Amino acid sequence: MSNMMKALVKSKPEVGLWMENVPVPEVGPNDVLIRVRKSAICGTDVHIWNWDQWAQKTIPVPMVVGHEFSGEIAEIGSAVTRYHVGERVSGEGHIVCGKCRNCRAGRGHLCRNTLGVGVNRPGSFGEFVCIPESNVVAIPEDISDEIAAIFDPFGNAVHTALSFDLVGEDVLVTGAGPIGIMGALVAKRSGARKVVITDINPHRLALARKLGIDHVVDASSENLADVMKSIGMTEGFDVGLEMSGAAPAFRDMIDKMNNGGKIAILGIAPAGFEIDWNKVIFKMLNLKGIYGREMFETWYKMIAFVQGGLDLAPIITHRIGIDEFRDGFEAMRSGNSGKVVMDWM
């Protein structure tokens, strides 16, 4: 195996990524080197491409980015015992310290010292990626490489949706991006009574309809209260999944929640936006922030969903070779795409 590889690198502090030849990551005793087959583009990667304020404060330059992937094991460290060369895998993109109070209590997703693959350390937009053995997840043979490559965002959706009991509940999802749509699918499959999803992007609304979400609402032209009445809802929503990061959508969600309703919040909203806290108080709402995936309970659950028949393939709207990466990022930046999966083989 050559000691050099192709990779997409944030090599300059400006807009874009660049395909370069870089050294293959070194494998430590507890590490696993994975030959990447498929990579998916995340909204985080778009922020890095755009070199916005968050990226400028967060991303070291130069660095290989990307964190959504699937592949096969190319090499294992001397202390690795659970995996073997050739095994099909994906990986948890949050690397935790294992030493803080939350880690020691089995709550790794709450680690205060989390390092993000492709954010704080070299990522998966390359022919190889190296992660600790503890972050590797084996992929069953009946799950394809492209579906395994979107397990990271699917895990966000599963973690958010399953934060509260959904059986028999009326669920509002704000934001029909890929994670929002997947969250709505999980809610529907988990026994929710009514599932309503809102957005203002026509492409995303059409994608939500294509994937079988029962009630898809264009918030730019439809009144949510009227929709609720038309589908037989006489009270507010029991569970809200806030996926949009849009202040108007969040405020509308709070308005439409039933007393005692529960809201799981994944969307990252603008700093300093206002909500009516009196409504939160007098409705006795339960707000819960969500970040990443529970390690590794969420992974077990999402594998079970897919093996149980949940079809995520339609959420992938663009399948391209890695040399077409610019087209993939343009599709993501336009907002007129679902997931974009790039092929490294």
UniProtKB/Swiss-Prot annotation:
Record GO biological process: L-threonine catabolic process to glycine
Quaternary structure (record): Homotetramer.
Cellular component terms per the entry's GO annotation: cytoplasm
Enzyme class: oxidoreductase
Annotated localization: Cytoplasm
GO molecular function, one term: L-threonine 3-dehydrogenase activity
Alphabetic keyword roster: Cytoplasm, Metal-binding, NAD, Oxidoreductase, Zinc
Protein name per its UniProtKB record: L-threonine 3-dehydrogenase
Lineage, opening ranks: Bacteria, Pseudomonadati, Pseudomonadota, Alphaproteobacteria, Hyphomicrobiales
Catalysed reaction equations from the record: L-threonine + NAD(+) = (2S)-2-amino-3-oxobutanoate + NADH + H(+)
Amino-acid positions noted as binding NAD(+) in the UniProt annotation, renumbered to this chain: 179, 199, 204, 266-268, 290-291
Required co-factors: Zn(2+)
Cofactor note: Binds 2 Zn(2+) ions per subunit.
Gene field: tdh
Catalytic machinery residues: 44 (charge relay system), 47 (charge relay system)
EC number: 1.1.1.103
Binding site for Zn(2+) 2: 97, 100, 103, 111
Feature type site, description Important for catalytic activity for the proton relay mechanism but does not participate directly in the coordination of zinc atom: 152
PROSITE patterns: ADH_ZINC (PS00059)
Pathway membership: Amino-acid degradation; L-threonine degradation via oxydo-reductase pathway; glycine from L-threonine: step 1/2
